[in-house]
Amino acid sequence: IAAGLQNVGADHNLQAIAQYLMAGKKLISFNGAADPLISPRDHLRNWQTVVQLAGSAGSNARFYLEPGVGHVLGGNGPDQTDYLGAMIAWVEQGTAPGQLVLTKFDSNGNATSSLPDCPYPTVPHYSGSGSVSAAASYTCATS
């Protein structure tokens, strides 16, 4: 099994990732909630273990669970966001990422819907007014 996991890039050492965070490095991790290949629950459990192992340095990590998103991209949910820009702002300016925006584009490049990309443990909650297809109609809150 371990050899098979290595072949798909799923081999990992959670203690090594925690040490990476303890060295002051930053980590943004995400998973599509509808990912059929990588279990969002397993990914979240691994992330929680890393944060626990890292102690106070666990604040150097963020996890985003993308509603309706499949493996990396695709699925019914908005699947595009700027994690690279968020990481650059965090590393270069010290601005830790919070709520981001996920956007779905049609084949012509037009935005068709958006949702907030909420840092765990928060999730998108509809405010009760506005378009259900617009991130502005949601807030990030704990379930």
Question: What do the PLM-derived regions correspond to, one by one?
Answer:
Residues 1-143:
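C-terminal His-loop and adjacent cap/lid subdomain of alpha/beta-hydrolase
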